Amino acid sequence: MKEAAIDPMSERTVSLTPGKRVFFLTKDPDLIRRQLRGELDLRMEDLRVEDLMDDINTDAMTPAWACFDYRPEDIARNAYAGITVNKERLFPEGALMAGGFEVIVSGYRKGVGSSRETAVQAEKWSGIRIAIAASFAPATCAASTFSAMFMARRPVAGAGRLTSPRA
C-alpha cells in the first residue's frame, strides 16, 4: 500500500489549544472508553505505535448509514460508529464531539477503504484539527487537505514537533 510522501521542509510547530485534549485510538477498548468518559488523558510517552489501532477503515470512521445525514454536525455525532466490540458501538453517539479533543492519534494506514470525505469531516466537525498517524492512506490525505485538517505522520514525542505530509 502506498503511503503519503513526506516533505522534510514542511515541518511546523503546532500547539494544542488550552483546555483541549488529545485522543489516542488504542487497540485497548477500555482505554478508549476511559478517554471518551474523561477519566484518562494519555500522552505520547505513555504508548508505543504498536499500542495504536492500525488499518482504520473509512467505513468504521463513518459507516454508510451515517453518510446520509445532511448536516456535518449530524455526521460528526456518529464519528467512529463502525468500531464495535461484541456488536456494540465503542464510540457512543456524540462521544468524540463531547470529549473536547483537538488531536487524534492512530497507528499505521489510517483511512484505508473507500474514499470517503465524510470520515475526515466527522473528525473535523467533532473538534479534531490535527490527525497524527504512523501512516495514512492516500485517499485520506486528499480528503484531509480538502477539509483543511493538519496531518502529521509518525507519532513524535516532545516539543509539539509534527511532520506534515503534502497531498
Name the predicted role of every residue range.
Residues 1-167:
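Fe-S-dependent hydro-lyases/dehydratases of central metabolism
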